[in-house]
Each structure stands twice: as structure tokens, then as C-alpha cells.
Amino acid sequence: MAKLKYKVEADPKNTARAMGRTLRISRKHAIELCRELSGMKLDAAVAYLNRVIALETPVPFKVHNKDLPHRKGKIGTHSGRFPQKASLEILQVLDNAKKNAEQKGLNTEKLRIKHISSNRGFTIKRYMPRAFGRASPKNQETIHIQVILEEFY
């Protein structure tokens, strides 16, 4: 596998980073979640993702919002979804970054998400057998998530 570099250079003294590789989640859901989580404090981001998993707070979909239903409440836009699977995977990557910050000796209560992004991973190619000896492709896309946490004062 190729070495994946971080998109943003950060000072290693006051930052902690983590990466989730080849996650089997929707690319569109990951893009919308990363846009929403960027710049949040870590505790607020974890609470937000837990509310999304519990179907209490929808994630506003601003780019991939064709044929989406309206959601009640203040979400910043009319349409939104509850991407539970993507939220769970991103929550695990954030937990890993928090543990990396603890290992470095950073104050975990004063961490904010400096950078979070999703990149396209490789495609797992599979085939579904059909009638009369044919086969249809059944491909699974994967993505990579990058997280950089920064200690603020």
C-alpha cells in the first residue's frame, strides 16, 4: 500500500493526529460529516456524533442534497440525514487521536479539530453471478479519514 501523507503540516509539539484507512463507509456521508466537524472542540464533536448515532440531530447535507427530505429544528439548512455508520467510524478515529494526544501529554480538554478530511481509498472489486453465465460488478468503495487535533489556549 502507498504511504499516505497528511494534507496539512502541523507543529508536532501541540498537535496530535490519527488516520483511519480503508473505511467502508459512504464517501458522500464522510464529506458532509468532515465539513460539519471541522473547527469544533473535541468534546463537542464527540457529543455531536453521539447525537447523530442516536438519531437526535441530523447532519446538514449542503453538497449532496438531491432528493433529501426536510428535517425539523435548526440544522443550518433544510435537508439532512443521520449517517450512523460514518459517524461511528469517525468517532473511532477521533478517539484514537485523543489517545495519541494523551500519550503526548497534551491537555485533552483543550483540544479542537484543526483539520479533518476524507480521501478516496481503493475500490474492492467483487462480482455478483447472474443468470445465463453473466456477472455484474459489485464494487465497494473505501475512504481514508485524516484528523489533526490542536491544543488551544
UniProtKB/Swiss-Prot annotation:
Designated name of the protein: Large ribosomal subunit protein uL22
Signal peptide from the UniProt entry: none
Subunit composition and interactions: Part of the 50S ribosomal subunit.
SUPFAM superfamilies, A to Z: Ribosomal protein L22 (SSF54843)
Example GO BP: cytoplasmic translation
GO CC terms in record: cytosolic large ribosomal subunit
Family, per entry: Belongs to the universal ribosomal protein uL22 family.
Species of origin: Methanococcus maripaludis (strain C5 / ATCC BAA-1333)
Keywords from the UniProt entry: Ribonucleoprotein, Ribosomal protein, RNA-binding, rRNA-binding
InterPro entries from the UniProt entry: Ribosomal_uL22, Ribosomal_uL22_CS, Ribosomal_uL22_euk/arc, Ribosomal_uL22_sf
GO molecular function: rRNA binding; structural constituent of ribosome
HAMAP family: Ribosomal_uL22_A
Annotated TM spans: none
Entries under Pfam families matching the protein: Ribosomal_L22
Gene designation: rpl22
Protein task: This protein binds specifically to 23S rRNA. It makes multiple contacts with different domains of the 23S rRNA in the assembled 50S subunit and ribosome.
CDD domains, per the entry: Ribosomal_L22
The keyword rRNA-binding is annotated on this UniProt entry: yes
